[in-house]
């Protein structure tokens, strides 16, 4: 389907969980002939990342309102009004056929500005519980989409757009068929690392000894400390790295993953077809718990909340999973995945753009 001459503005910023799914949809539509611009903030990751993907970006000034002091709270209406004005000027200049909100602070003023300009707004909620901005914008959006059931009562469940190299991994029954020896445990802390993983897993390695082999991604600045912890535990045979550049290769290597349960991580693990032990980040909305719950309910994962995440608890879970169990869990994870999430979101964007009056001309 050709999108020749159609214009999309993607609103997403702050974290990879918002930006990467937006980029996946943007590239998919650009391949169909769409023009794409981005709306973001100049001091967050999208400012560097989006232009590297060949997409022009416009900036507005906005930041989060949660947990700020009284002066910031009092000035919030003025700052939001100014951000909406900035976004509206950008919308009028670019004249998109449709706007896609993928989350982050920028989506609020951007979505309101689009609505004021009569431009259809499509929202995508990546997490199992809706963020404040998306909850608010859902009342004015043309279409609301969600990655996991439950964020919105009536929204279509379309999954999270996931990287193509992860989607291309062989099915679990092919990948895991002839494996033997120690169970391969991939520990992923993300770019900043996860202290609870870095502190607990060396002890788990000592407890389970030669029954497991670990590849532990520790995050920025934690390499020497965690290497020392494994050494002190008499476990020098494991692979400890600060970052993992090729996550698809790491997933292909692993029999099981131990990690946080950010929205994209959960979606990637399901797409890869991997069993998981999740330790959700302790957030007051319990966002990561709700992200992980569908996989636990499907029998593909186990959740251990951070206060209970101990050497004994983790060792007990991992030692209870033999290769037969892990293969069944991997197949259940793959069954929960929505591999065509990018295409589903792109189709809804196209439909919303098509619903706009065809006589609207670009300036």
From Swiss-Prot:
Enzyme class of the recorded protein, top EC level: transferase
Pfam families: Glyco_tran_28_C (PF04101), Glyco_transf_28 (PF03033)
Protein name: UDP-N-acetylglucosamine--N-acetylmuramyl-(pentapeptide) pyrophosphoryl-undecaprenol N-acetylglucosamine transferase
InterPro entries on file: GlcNAc_MurG (IPR006009), Glyco_trans_28_C (IPR007235), GlycoTrans_28_N (IPR004276)
PANTHER family: GLYCOSYLTRANSFERASE, UDP-N-ACETYLGLUCOSAMINE--N-ACETYLMURAMYL-(PENTAPEPTIDE) PYROPHOSPHORYL-UNDECAPRENOL N-ACETYLGLUCOSAMINE TRANSFERASE 1
Catalytic activity: di-trans,octa-cis-undecaprenyl diphospho-N-acetyl-alpha-D-muramoyl-L-alanyl-D-glutamyl-meso-2,6-diaminopimeloyl-D-alanyl-D-alanine + UDP-N-acetyl-alpha-D-glucosamine = di-trans,octa-cis-undecaprenyl diphospho-[N-acetyl-alpha-D-glucosaminyl-(1->4)]-N-acetyl-alpha-D-muramoyl-L-alanyl-D-glutamyl-meso-2,6-diaminopimeloyl-D-alanyl-D-alanine + UDP + H(+)
CDD domains: GT28_MurG (cd03785)
Keywords assigned by UniProt, alphabetized: Cell cycle, Cell division, Cell inner membrane, Cell membrane, Cell shape, Cell wall biogenesis/degradation, Glycosyltransferase, Membrane, Peptidoglycan synthesis, Transferase
Main localization category: membrane
UniProt-listed Enzyme Commission number(s): 2.4.1.227
GO biological process: carbohydrate metabolic process; cell division; cell wall organization; lipid glycosylation; peptidoglycan biosynthetic process; regulation of cell shape
Gene field: murG
Source species: Pectobacterium atrosepticum (strain SCRI 1043 / ATCC BAA-672)
GO terms for cellular component: plasma membrane
Pathway: Cell wall biogenesis; peptidoglycan biosynthesis
GO molecular function: UDP-N-acetyl-D-glucosamine:N-acetylmuramoyl-L-alanyl-D-glutamyl-meso-2,6-diaminopimelyl-D-alanyl-D-alanine-diphosphoundecaprenol 4-beta-N-acetylglucosaminlytransferase activity; undecaprenyldiphospho-muramoylpentapeptide beta-N-acetylglucosaminyltransferase activity
Cell compartments where the protein resides: Cell inner membrane
